[in-house]
A protein has these predicted regions:
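Aromatic sugar-binding surface patches on proteins
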Residues: 95-105, 111, 237-242
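Exposed beta-strand face motif in extracellular beta-rich ectodomains
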Residues: 113-119, 240-242, 257-259
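Short, polar/proline-rich extracytoplasmic segments that appear immediately after membrane translocation
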Residues: 2-47, 126-160, 164, 187-188, ...
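Short flexible loop/turn segments that cap and initiate beta-strands
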Residues: 65, 69-90, 192-195, 256-260
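Short coil/turn motif common to extracellular beta-sandwich-like domains
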Residues: 54-60
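Extracellular acidic, Ser/Thr/Pro-rich low-complexity tracts
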Residues: 63-71, 83, 123-125, 182-188
């Protein structure tokens, strides 16, 4: 074999050896695993408005909500509103959202004092978080009466005329035929103050000092131009009767007389 032929044979043999040395391609699958822990949501009340609240009114509660597993992991957002004595006033559910709010109404008789709102977020794994915040309800003194005039009729000097009340609220009108009643429309116990004045056109003073009143079971007390207090303690939502009597002194000039009865409620 010539020298050239030997070189070619050697090159070919080398190439074959190189081809045999290259490994064939291979693959395999390896499983992986992990556990993502469920963590509790985080809820916070940011504002309660108005504070203080004056009933009757609507109260708005706002706040924030988050969850390490995502907001979609939160299943419910519930609330409880508690009175100053801790009893439940109202409860319900709010829409689950990163920024949430809900409203509730305070009625006229909502107790004055410190109220509490509790909000609870619960996720799909039953983990929960609760936040609470207080707000104040103002004292409201309010009342209504069912009479707009008291007519004692014609009275002889030396005699008296009484207009009696009852505890049933009627359509507002003159007494009689209406039987005077007062109702506590506020959110606290009230006492009553009453005063009376004579019109300047009267022939002489008549009502001042000659009119007496009984509120509920308190009285009779003589009414003057200064306020007289009836310690009657009318509870919120309750009523009391008002009886009044006009005594006409002997020697009183004949004629038509008019006056003004002023009724004021104060905290009892």
């Amino acid at each position: 074999m010539s020298a050239r032929g030997k070189i070619i044979a050697i090159l070919v043999a080398g190439m074959v050896a190189m081809a045999i040395a290259v490994p064939m391609a291979m693959s395999d699958d390896v499983g992986t695993s992990a556990t993502v822990n469920n963590l509790a949501p985080d809820v916070a009340i940011t504002t309660i408005s108005p504070d203080p609240a004056t009933p009757p009114c609507t109260v708005t509660v706002s706040g924030t909500l988050s969850d390490p597993n995502g907001i979609d992991d939160v299943s419910t957002l519930t609330y409880v509103v508690r009175k100053p004595n801790g009893s439940t006033y109202t409860s319900g559910s709010a829409t689950v959202a990163a920024s949430w709010s809900f409203n509730f109404n305070l009625d006229s008789y909502a107790d004055a004092g410190t109220w509490t709102v509790e909000v609870t977020a619960t996720d799909k794994g039953s983990l929960s978080d609760t936040d609470s915040k207080t707000f104040n309800v103002s004292e409201v003194i309010a009342f209504s009466i069912d009479f707009n005039k008291t007519n004692y009729g014609s009275i002889d000097p030396g005699n008296a005329s009484t207009v009696s009340g009852d505890t049933t609220m009627e359509t507002v009108g003159p007494a009689p035929p209406v039987k005077p009643t007062i109702k506590n429309e506020g959110n606290t116990v009230i006492d009553i103050q009453m005063s009376i004045t004579d019109d300047a056109s009267n022939p002489e003073p008549l009502f001042v000092g000659n009119t007496s009143a009984t509120v509920g079971s308190v009285g009779p007390q003589t009414l003057t131009s200064a306020a007289t207090t009836f310690d009657v303690n009318i509870a919120k939502g309750d009523t009391a009767k008002i009886d009044t009597t006009l005594s006409v002194p002997t020697g009183t000039s004949p004629g038509d007389y008019a006056g003004t009865l002023t009724i004021t409620a104060v905290s009892g």
